[in-house]
């Protein structure tokens, strides 16, 4: 969508969504950006051979930006540099501009005793407090692995353990895998292809079930979601009693809710207007909101991502589960699903039977299980 002369333009396919590039007005800065890029390219070719990263950057441009995810194939090298520099962009919601303000005050590391959110231009009370807590827990002088010692936030009564709670994570694909066979109409589909669901059984053990699509399709997405609904209903009837309300469904961030909305749209569009049974309203509980609201901070974690939090709890011996080293992460799971789906077309085999998909299932279970262990750890030690 764009607006020109107070008129709004919208489009559904690629040719309808073209927008003008106005070099005489709002887009005139692209000339300067292009010239700057050319100058940088020439400078690197001429001078770059003599630049050094360690012990400190020989030119300002070599300071890494931990928030920039477009670093392939240099991701690991950049991570090492960020770690050794104790770079300020490693901090939660701190980027290039905030670091520049700190550098202007001759502050170059996140553990500098004089670094404050205000120096970085961060004045919002809540954001500033959160940053101070992250810096505090990560200082070498601090011996606590988790702060605060006692968590006040009891949103949704989470501190009181219920007889049954579900811990859920989705694996999904987006529309990037578009072969352009339908161009200019968009191709690819945003789908849930795996639902992992775990809970603590009455005897205290972890119980987990995963629902995986046979192929990437709306019908398979609908099938695994409805099987997951049925599974939660059966477990609730067995552990609680028949016709009891579903218990809390713990998840991490708003992603699951957004993908459920997308799955509902996919289902309705596939039905072509036919009447469908209503999907149940689910008692979602986003534990990330609890972590941010308090805030709960962990030594070694510089933000609130589930992996950063859980890996460092595991490192400190506070939970028992973590991810094994391997090719699977969120992006790897997505690419793996596309690969497996192509194998379905070639072999007629279900994605569920493929080795790579089984690795993704194992990865998904860890996502769910570390949430369970994390919540239990905080209940037992910080409430």
Language-model region placement:
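Conserved DEDDh/DEDDy metal-dependent 3′-5′ exonuclease domain
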Residues: 1-37, 208-335
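Acidic, Mg2+-coordinating catalytic module of metal-dependent nucleases/exonucleases
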Residues: 4-90, 96-99, 105, 309-383
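Helix-hairpin-helix
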Residues: 83-133
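Short, well-ordered loop/turn elements at secondary-structure boundaries
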Residues: 96, 104, 159-163, 191, ...
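Generic, well-ordered alpha-helical scaffold segments in large soluble proteins
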Residues: 101, 105, 116, 171-174, ...
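Flexible loop/turn segments at secondary-structure boundaries
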Residues: 109-111, 121-123, 143, 173-177, ...
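Charged, flexible boundary elements
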Residues: 121-157
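Conserved RNase H-like, two-metal-ion catalytic cores of nucleic-acid enzymes
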Residues: 142-241, 267-269
């Amino acid at each position: 969508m764009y607006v020109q002369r107070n008129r709004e333009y919208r489009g559904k396919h690629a040719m309808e969504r073209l927008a003008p590039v106005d070099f005489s007005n709002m887009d005139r800065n692209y000339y300067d950006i292009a010239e700057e890029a050319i100058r940088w390219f020439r400078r690197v070719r001429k001078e770059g051979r003599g630049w050094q990263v360690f012990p400190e950057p020989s030119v300002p441009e070599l300071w890494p930006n931990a928030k920039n995810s477009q670093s392939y194939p240099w991701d690991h090298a950049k991570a090492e540099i960020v770690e050794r520099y104790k770079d300020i962009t490693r901090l939660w919601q701190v980027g290039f501009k905030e670091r520049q303000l700190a550098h202007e005050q001759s502050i170059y590391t996140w553990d500098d005793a004089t670094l404050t959110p205000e120096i970085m231009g961060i004045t919002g009370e809540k954001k500033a407090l959160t940053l101070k807590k992250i810096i505090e827990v990560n200082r070498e002088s601090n011996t606590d692995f988790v702060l605060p010692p006692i968590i006040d936030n009891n949103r949704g009564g989470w501190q009181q353990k219920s007889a049954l709670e579900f811990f859920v994570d989705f694996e999904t694909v987006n529309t990037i895998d578009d072969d352009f066979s339908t161009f200019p109409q968009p191709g690819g589909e945003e789908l849930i292809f795996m639902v992992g669901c775990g809970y603590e059984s009455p005897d205290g053990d972890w119980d987990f079930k995963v629902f995986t699509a046979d192929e990437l399709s709306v019908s398979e997405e609908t099938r695994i979601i409805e099987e997951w609904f049925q599974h939660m209903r059966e477990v609730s009837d067995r552990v609680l009693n028949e016709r009891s309300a579903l218990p809390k469904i713990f998840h991490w961030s708003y992603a699951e809710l957004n993908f459920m909305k997308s799955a509902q749209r996919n289902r309705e569009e596939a039905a072509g207007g036919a009447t469908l049974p209503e999907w149940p309203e689910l008692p979602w509980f986003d534990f990330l909101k609890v972590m941010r609201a308090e805030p709960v901070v962990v030594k070694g974690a510089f933000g609130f991502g589930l992996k950063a939090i859980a890996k460092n709890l595991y490192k400190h011996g506070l939970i028992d589960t973590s991810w094994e080293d391997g090719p699977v992460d969120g992006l790897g799971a997505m690419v793996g699903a596309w690969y497996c789906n192509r194998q379905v077309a070639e072999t007629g085999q279900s994605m569920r039977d493929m080795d790579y998909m089984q690795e993704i299932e194992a990865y998904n279970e860890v996502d769910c299980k570390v949430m369970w262990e994390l919540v239990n750890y905080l209940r037992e030690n910080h409430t």
